[in-house]
Amino acid sequence: MRFAVLFALALLGAHEYSLGQSTQSFTNPIIAGFYPDPSICRVGNDYYLVNSTFSYFPGITVFHSKDLVHWKLIGYVLNRPEQLNLDGQGVSRGLFAPAIRYRNGLFYVTCTLVDIGGNFVATSKNPAGPWSNPVWLPQINGIDPSLFFDDDGKAYIIYNSIPPDNKPLYNGHRTIRIREIDPESLRVKGDERVLINGGTNIEKKPVWIEAPHILKKDGAYYLIAAEGGTAGQHSEVVFKSVNVEGPYVSYQNNPILTQRQLNPKRAFAITSTGHADFVQTESGDWWAVFLGCRPYRPYEEEYYNTGRETFLAPVRWNDGWPIINPGHEEVQYRYLYPIHPSTDSIDIPTSGNFRSRDEFDSKELNLNWVCLRTPHEKWFDLMQKKGYLSMRLRPETCAGSMNPSFLGRRQQHLSGSASTALVFNPKAENEKAGLLIFQNEKHFYFLCKSTEGNEPVIQLYKSGSSGNSTSGMELIASSLIGKDQGENEVLLRIEAKEDKYSFSYTYDSGRWIVLKDSIDAKFLSTRVAGGFVGCMYAMYATSQEKESNSVAAYDWFEYSGDDEVYK
């Protein structure tokens, strides 16, 4: 499949961080859009990074980079239905907080499949895959597992778990625990130990200590973890010990990363930073990847539709303790490159402003496209109509809890657009195909072609159950387009401008017809919709709980991002 990058990323002129002699800077976030909970490892001069994917399939993104800045999606850990069944799972359930590690020619990814199987390990000799089926760890009671391989050959698994005796002292009281694990058989052994009870200072009732990782430096063990919850109070903290199993001492200057103390009205705010992982370059420098959020105006109200994104910042060691983002309070949109910039080609940028177009002219779907939950049958095809993505209409809907005919890619910018060209001849009013902007089952907008009284029509639906509703949607705008256009290709476009979406269509690409302008985008924000994901633009076709043999064919899909902060 050919993706043409039509507009390269533009870097903003903001604060710079002086590191070494380099004069080139990179743009944060390094992986924009809904790519949360990053974990990273280095093998030689190659870097690999994974993210949470919740109930999207394939599960657990695997990125590769040579310079920590330019990232290419190379595969998924769980890309076979027998590895991962997400039937019935809410969008913000599924796969939580993976961690990637490497030992003796083998990559390990640990993760939690919440509500279903619990914690597991998957392995592969090639990070691009294929990966093994999950090896389940029923003895590990908790979430956010991470492996640590010590110098003596022993391996440990660290995770977030229940309070001592499962008796919380306050809401949000959790522990960090450790158990030894056999790196060959992946069997847990030995006794469980509590490393951290509550957080940095239990007398102050710290909440949601989670996402632990252990690293070793100069003979000392460092445990880093997130604290404060994933919203505005999010932070990263560190503990230190001379023994891997503790006791651990909290750093007196914790947290080592947070934005919670800053003016919420500051322009182009980066908020909710935490859930970090460390990596050391070949030259010995340390860097941290972590999640953060970018609200749109008014910044202090914390509305964002792009989800939690992956950021990169330098780490400085001071008197035996690490500090993320040294010399700054605010996380920077620009830092100097950690490594000489790579010249490797990237088909789709992950940072800055860009435009990309998918022509659907390959035998395989580009890795950027994801399904909503696990597909159990073949419902899309790239060869049925050459140069088109053909999608069968099926009874499942995006408001349900199964796998609809839905192929999505992330909204990676506060301002931008998604557009597509659709060939579709609906045979009944329940048949609809088009372009979706989707947050979760109860928060989405659907711009589609359908039929009304035997006349072709362009419709805009909002998720909901009031008014003129069908299958979890409420009709908010429509336009009859005439039978002479019924079988012609129609172009559909959704434009995002921070807190507004606009919906347009055309049969002539030079003259867009606005169906509905300036619709509330806050309705799809994390603050309103809840959960842990960000918005997806999706090609979506449904027959709304009825059987159908109709097919929708998409000629191309174009995504464009144009955020002010990068200009």
Where are these regions (language model features)?
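Bacterial Sec-dependent N-terminal signal peptides
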Residues: 1-23
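Carbohydrate-active catalytic/glycan-binding domains of CAZyme proteins
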Residues: 19-567
